[in-house]
Amino acid sequence: MAAAERRILTLAIVLASAMVAQAFGRFTWGVVLPDARDDLLDGSNTAAGLFGSLNVGAYLLGTIVVAWLASRSSLVGLVKVGLVLSTSGLALASFTTRPAVLALALVIMGLGGAIIWVPVPGIAARQFPPERRGFATGIAGVGIGVGIVFAGRMAAFLRSGEQDVWQTLYRIELCIALIVIASAFVFLRSQRERPSVAGGFGGFGALRQVQGWKALTGAYSAYGFSYILVISYTVARLEDDAGWTSGRAALAFTTIGFAVIAGGLIVGSISDRIGRRLTMTIAFVSWAVASIGILTGSLPVVLVSTVLVGIMFSGIPATIIAHVVAHADERSFGPVFSATTLAFGIAQAVSPQIGGAIADWRGSFTLVFWLAAAVALIGAMAAWSLPEDDIEVGGDVPTDF
């Protein structure tokens, strides 16, 4: 296979893998949460938040695992391991009638999500020259956006004919995941296996070599705490607090997915032109504004806000990853990004449980979204503390992964 064709095929498979790991294995929970909560969890937002925390807590554990695996496996090898876990979790969620098994499924999908997500941006970024790294890392979010759109629209379609559809949606996603995992094992291969260098515990030894690593880690942590609140509770907020129908709430969630598809490309490309620091700061402020906009309950304002959420949902990580890629070569990328993702994972692990408890305490999700906006502004301050200029050390596009 020609090099150009192999790169296209590689991109297609890793983007589909990101869709399975993130959109299906993690963010579909936000779509099915009201149905699953009422079906298995006795309508408890606290329990639903705990289940969300189990998923992101497992994601946190996965970042530690992948930091260890990165020095022993190629990036492609990590993608395959993550796919096995994510697909297994989808299978459990598709057929269980027990809350404990659903919790286990979310844990497994959280592990798979981390193990896949860490290598995917690195593989995508190395397909492009250094001056296009922001655009390249934005591509990694395309698969996630497509998956979110699919989950939102499919949920709306299923609800038009059935009362309880959350497991039907998971079963459909399982079928897609089986196709993706088969494609990965057949077509996705490393030309020369070259594991990442060791980076200390959790990759933090390698991370400390990255310029502005403290500000970068703080920004990514703020993003992790804030985004999971908005993604997890937008549908519940609109249905429970604003009185929206499930179909209209699913439409709002779908607009997030459509915007995610383009958001990473747009924001990543902007960061190539005006710099990561300024772009990231503006993105965090925009996220805060959008979080507050969802609280209005007004259809036009909410739809504009969800579009903005979608753009920044993929745009903020694109700029963060581009900064990492600019300061790490292909062998140190795994440990470095694992370490930043570990901090991000800690923040998002505690966030859903806090949000669910606040919603039960206050009887609404209003304070939850104000909290998301406040933390986003903290992220903006951290982003503004980054050094102004990136230093490219990645070199030419490699031919191995």
Could you describe each region identified by the protein language model?
Residues 61-97, 271, 277:
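Conserved MFS/SLC helix-loop-helix module at the cytosolic interface between two early adjacent transmembrane helices
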Residues 106-142:
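Cytoplasmic helix-loop-helix junction between adjacent transmembrane helices
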Residues 139-188:
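Helix-loop-helix hairpin linking two adjacent transmembrane segments in secondary transporters
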